[in-house]
Amino acid sequence: TVGVVTGLILSFANVSSLYEMSLLAFSGLLGGLLKDGKKLGARLGLVVGSLLIGLYAQADQGLTTNLYESLTAVVLFLLTPSFVLKNLSKLVPGTSENMLEQQQYVRKIRDVTANRVEQFSNVFQALSKSFTQNGFYDEKPSADKEVDYFLSSVTERTCQFCFKKEQCWAQQFDTTYEYMKEIMLEVDNGTLEQNPRLIREMDKHCVKSKKVIDVIEHELTYFKANQHLKAQIQESRRIVAEQLHGVSEVMGNFAKEIKRERENLNVQEEQILEALRNFGMEINQIEIYSLEPGNVDIEMWVPYCHGRGECEKIIAPMLTDILGESIVVKNEECAKYPQGYCHVSFGCTKAYVVDTGVAHAAKGGGFVSGDSYSMIELNAGKYALAISDGMGNGERAHYESSETLQLLKQILQTGIEETIAIKSINSILSLRTNDEIFSTLDLAMIDLQDANVNFLKIGSTPSFIKRGDKVIKIQASNLPMGIIEEFEVDVVNEQMKAEDLLIMMSDGVFEGPKHVENYEMWMKRKIGELQTNDPQEIADLIMEEVIRTKVGLIEDDMTVVVAKLQHNTPKWSSIPSYAYRNLAQ
């Protein structure tokens, strides 16, 4: 190509230079065919090309002249230092030096990016720790200390200039303190008027008892408001600390993923290269980062295939047979020119896939339901199923439940752990308004690699797993979100299998059947009697059965979500490569 372009440029200056173009093109072709001989092959290609072209040259251009010119070029080529040729090769697309230069540039950018992300991770971690240190996120003061602070503010306004101050607070401190503390508790409970004995004793003990009681009643309102504000500030700081810690972990994991280094797997690289080349595939370079089962990570540089999909249809199926893992193309960056190389990443596909079905109905057959549901496929190889039931019915309940699921989705997609996500949502719901906003949450996190499921049930009804004729109940005890500011999430773990059915429902379905004393036994029996394995049909049949027991009435919002776990079948079957099968082992 370089010879043709050079000869073409010469022909622009003089038409007679077309002869040189032919010579350079033919010599370049021979040099390319003899590229394994490196400098010797290139020299031999030029000399042979000159001899062959010279035999067909015009009379005014003899063979001797062409041969002298070619030998001169060979001598200059020999005198040219190797580092100059290498530097020139770096500028020519398609050469191994150019590709190596690009790889080094990419690695440099990768390392710089990873270091910056890691620095941000350390900053967020430091900020998180600063919120948990003394002075920012202290433990709550004890009740006795709070009472002491309150009574101190009361005495400043009542006893500070009283002539009996010395007698009450020096000689009879315990008696005075107990009287004022008891009055405070009675006022707080609204039962002071029902305790005349305490009022009489206070009148005998204090000359300003009426003023003391009035000040306590007045100050108690501000005291309660101040306590509530302190609790909200403390909870806000806790949320910030947890969120900063979560963000720090996500960024730290991201930095580790960027900075992943190649493992010392040269033998496996050569075996894979040989197997692919024996099949007729040309592979320029291969890098293995991991052959760990379930976490295979391989990168290759392959010639541009003009959109024929050779990586997906041939290389990935061969790797599947060689490694004993289901391998697919994770990312593909095609070459920008026909003779270039494509950068392809291969990795393990998910071992399982989830097929879902949903049945949904609003109270009274309306259009707005207080129930919301969501199915979220996360980047970490997990699949989330969630149902949220807002308090009551109608638009307000729909807003509560949909807001809960929207927050959950956004937090989970960042990679933050589900327990931290739920605690954060609970704190946000309890802090964002003075209104009572409660909502339940039924969350199932399915690991698509090993079929392990974590159930997080916040005030929700039981779920069921149907495995053949067996029905398994999943239940946990947690209050609805938004009631209390801080709580521990009870996580239930269950191992699912292929062809298992997971059935989740809101309370409108679970507690919906009329004239049924034991909802759990009734639901397990109905699920066990189902004759279909289609998730959508199961959701529809359960919904229909519950509505039939109520003579067609829908007295509450109703939602059923059904998920079926199945083995993941690759799009392309594996291509046998018996010589190196299971080399990863």
Swiss-Prot record:
Job description of the protein: Normally needed for pro-sigma E processing during sporulation but can be bypassed in vegetative cells. Activates SpoIIAA by dephosphorylation.
Domain PPM-type phosphatase: 355-565
Residues spanning the membrane: 40-57, 70-86
Keyword Transmembrane among record annotations: yes
UniProt-listed PANTHER family: STAGE II SPORULATION PROTEIN E (PTHR43156:SF2), STAGE II SPORULATION PROTEIN E-RELATED (PTHR43156)
GO molecular function: protein serine/threonine phosphatase activity
Name this polypeptide is given: Stage II sporulation protein E
Membrane topology: Multi-pass membrane protein
UniProt KW keywords: Cell membrane, Hydrolase, Membrane, Protein phosphatase, Sporulation, Transmembrane, Transmembrane helix
Reaction equations catalysed: O-phospho-L-seryl-[protein] + H2O = L-seryl-[protein] + phosphate; O-phospho-L-threonyl-[protein] + H2O = L-threonyl-[protein] + phosphate
One cellular component term from this protein's GO annotations in UniProt: plasma membrane
Subcellular location, record wording: Cell membrane
EC number(s) recorded for this UniProt protein: 3.1.3.16
Gene3D superfamilies referenced in this protein's UniProt entry, alphabetically: PPM-type phosphatase domain
Keyword Coiled coil tagged: no
Taxonomic lineage: Bacteria, Bacillati, Bacillota, Bacilli, Bacillales
Enzyme class: hydrolase
SUPFAM superfamilies: PP2C-like (SSF81606)
One record GO biological process: sporulation resulting in formation of a cellular spore
